[in-house]
Amino acid sequence: MAIFKVNGQSVQPEKNQKLLRFLRDELHLTSVKDGCSEGACGACTVIIDGKTCKACVPDTDSLDGREIITVEGLTEWEQQVYTYAYGKAGAVQCGFCIPGMVMCTKALLDENMEPTDDEIRYALRNNYCRCTGYVKIMDAVRLAAKILKAGEIPDDGDPNWTLGNRVARIDVEEKVLGYGKYPDDFYLDGMLYGVALRSKYARARVLSIDTSRAKALPGVEAVVTAEDIPGENKIGHLKHDQYTLIPVGSLVHYLGDAIALVAAKDRETAEKAIKLIKVEYEALPHVHTIEEAAAPDAPKVFDEEENNICAHKHISRGNAEEAIRNSKYVISHHFETPWTEHAFLEPECAVAFYDEDGDVFIYSTDQSAHQTLHECSLLLGTDKVKVQNALVGGGFGGKEDMTVQHLAALLTYVTKKPVKVKFTRAESLLVHPKRHPFYMDMTMGCDEDGNIMGVKASVTSDTGAFASLGGPVLERACTHAAGPYHYENFEIEGTAYYTNNPPAGAFRGFGVTQTCFATETLLNMMADKVGITPWEIRYRNAIRPGEVLPNGQIVDDSTGLVETLEAVKEDYDAAMAAGKPVGIGCAMKNAGVGVGIPDTGRVKLIVEDDEKLHIYSGASCIGQGLGTVLVQMIVTNTDIRQEDIVYERSNTWISPDSGTTSGSRQTLVTGEACRRACEKLDRKSTRLNSSHEWISRMPSSA
């Protein structure tokens, strides 16, 4: 076996394996993140003999005599520089990609202290970041180069932690240096690894399941099927329509449906066992398009439903048909948007175990710990369940639905041992809900000056194999389809269909993105037909405070569309005059639950034995920086110093439920709850001596 050095220490793996697995599973160097294991994402980047390399690519046997450096092997000075640079530049969000980016930065700056922008881009070319768009990461590289060349970190003085000031995030160090723990970074004594057997068909009936050969495989601790579930088998974000494990005699709805689970001593053994499970199916006709799903004789995705319609929405104001008929200009067009993958860098992972209270404890990476608690408790048939968010490597809506948490909990319940369930990137792509594909037919009428007279639209969406959030997504798509414009006549009819495709659910924009694309494109077409610029047609129709949107909402003073358009006009006109036209588009989106539903945020402030104020909230921090905002909120509204405040990650036994982290709502509603809790604290006290919980209930608007 090969002998090589890792961070200056000689090591000799006992077996040939991927370097990534050796670094993580045996040396527990968890700064080396596993984002894909396919040589694609760059989250596992290390330095080998001065050059960057993705650790998931080389086998350990190929590394004899080589020298490997991970973030853990950086000098103390280098760690300080990169923490400062990435924090100061605002380059860290979910943080999952950052250790890999740091290693790319080090390899570049070790050779070139004055890199050009092109050289920085080239150095980072193999590393993905889903959150930032790379601009801030490039800023961090430039700043790190400047500091390394100067030989000292700038003295910025004490930062001002009140709202409105720029500060480094409270979690920047643990994310830059890679010691902050995502669920996959937990290695517990005696931990097993869980893997699911998934359906061979998109639609079929399971006739029998034979697990005998899998159970006999050495290293297998348990093989679990539907009959082993102690509580409710079905889960679902709003509607419980998805089997955790498909029972014999029931239908599978898509290729991601799980049939059985295996818990084994390692993932390799679990994967071998999965292949030994024999499932007999009756393959059935399936539907993969809306046309197929809507056909009168279409196979039903759910036997118990009358048809394949998941949700229907109709909104009408004024008389759109008459307004369009009387318009000077009329344009009709068909638009389509595709399925879209969230592409968060951290694949779904959960670790479950029995804690000292005899509760099933789950470390999860999701957008609502309390939602996970609810569904796992129903599955296990017990309220002795706890959930805590570890670090979350991005969500964007894709981690609102259950994926791995309940599987880890079930295997722990059965085996009484710690269990880790982690998706491969291929599983993640298959299983978790995607952005809905939309098919839209839209007609717009305008007068001779380009003023919108009326819009009529018909939209359909493919919500896949389960309801997930298909109904609310359709509702947002329809209520926002009119755009941020002022006109009286609007009608839209929307239908979401079940198919045997992977489910579709929440994704940033939540349905608004799709119809906004259609409306804005149609508006550009109309501007061309009327003979005015895309800027001008938007300005003439822009909604102003006090006016009524086509969906019936009265706009308040917070709307600044006119001012925004005016602010860009000079640059827009200059680009057009220079023959370098730029695109322009307008959009509106609810902050919070939306459609008039009251929204709730909760915060609990507790002075612990360390005499520091601890912030507890059930709101998940998925990279958006909620913890930093809440700390700033307290500093702004009290005399408590930042160093006397501790932000606790969301859990379900102390942190009050603050709803799902979605809809850009947490700073608004949970932040307001935090502000109100601050009012209960003694602003003038030098010693913290109280604890308060406050609930913020706020009306939501589109």
Question: What is the predicted role of each segment?
Answer:
Residues 1-156, 595:
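Signature of N-terminal electron-transfer/Fe-S-associated modules in redox systems
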Residues 90, 165, 171-177, 238, ...:
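Glycine-rich loop/linker segments at domain edges
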Residues 688-702:
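Single conserved hydrophobic/aromatic residue that forms the stacking wall/gate
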Residues 297-378, 542-612:
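Helix-loop-helix junctions that connect adjacent transmembrane helices in secondary transporters/permeases
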